[in-house]
Every structure is written in structure tokens, then in C-alpha cells.
Amino acid sequence: MAINREILAKSDIKVEVELKRSLIGKLDSKVKTLKALGLKRIGDRKIHVLNKSLQGMLNSVISMVLLSEVKNG
């Protein structure tokens, strides 16, 4: 998950967030954070613009998601 941390260090870029772990048995706060990001099932992907509020949300669920930078092309 070191790659996730490198991407989080950047700002104002587009990132794709993919849910990699199940929500079963997780804390309610983490489940609500993931649902606010638009992730409900394993494999769900959403594209977001990385800003300070999104960085805070992703920091709390970093072990459950995979981040990748979206290249404009």
C-alpha cells in the first residue's frame, strides 16, 4: 500500500479509487466513508479529484482501497 501513500501525497489530480476489501465486520465510520465515496461492493471504482477533504477520507480507509492516478489522454 506504499503506492497509495505516494498518490495521496499529491494534490489536484484525478484518482481512481477501487474497493478491494469487504465491508462486512468493519466499523460503521469506515462503511459510511466508503459509501460517501460511492463504493458499495468489492471491485467498485470511482474517479475523484484529489483534494484535502478526499485525502482525509482516503486516509481512514487506505487499507481497504486501491488508488491509481488517472492520466488525461
Swiss-Prot record:
It comes from Borrelia hermsii (strain HS1 / DAH). Pfam families: Ribosomal_L30 (PF00327). The gene is rpmD. InterPro entries: Ribo_uL30_ferredoxin-like_sf, Ribosomal_uL30_bac-type, Ribosomal_uL30_ferredoxin-like. GO terms for molecular function: structural constituent of ribosome. The keyword Ribonucleoprotein applies. The keyword Ubl conjugation does not apply. Part of the 50S ribosomal subunit. Keywords: Ribonucleoprotein, Ribosomal protein. The lineage of its organism: Bacteria, Pseudomonadati, Spirochaetota, Spirochaetia, Spirochaetales. Belongs to the universal ribosomal protein uL30 family. Gene3D superfamilies: Ribosomal protein L30, ferredoxin-like fold domain. GO terms for cellular component: large ribosomal subunit. Coiled coil: none annotated. GO terms for biological process: translation. This is Large ribosomal subunit protein uL30.
